[in-house]
Curated annotation (Swiss-Prot):
Stated family: Belongs to the bacterial ribosomal protein bL35 family.
Entry annotated with the keyword Coiled coil: no
Name of protein: Large ribosomal subunit protein bL35
Signal peptide: none
HAMAP family: Ribosomal_bL35 (MF_00514)
Matches recorded under InterPro entries: Ribosomal_bL35, Ribosomal_bL35-like, Ribosomal_bL35_sf
Coiled-coil intervals, chain numbering: none
Length: 65
């Protein structure tokens, strides 16, 4: 049986941590930023953890992580 492939999109966007959690970047921060307030842009900085309701699909996309 051949190996399962990791989805390239998940590989580029997600980082698996040592405790089993998955880290992701915030969306809506790439373009059309002039109409967004400074507060909104500040709150979109940094990374957050993937929610537990999405972890099953993330694990399916990254079988060896």
């Amino acid at each position: 049986m051949p190996k399962m492939k990791t989805k390239s999109s998940a590989k580029k966007r997600l980082k698996v941590l040592g405790n089993g959690g998955v880290k992701r970047s915030m969306a809506f921060k790439r373009h059309i930023l002039t109409k967004k307030t400074t507060k909104t842009k500040r709150q979109l900085r940094g990374t957050v953890m993937v929610h537990e309701t999405n972890m099953a699909s993330v694990r399916a996309m990254m079988p060896y992580a």
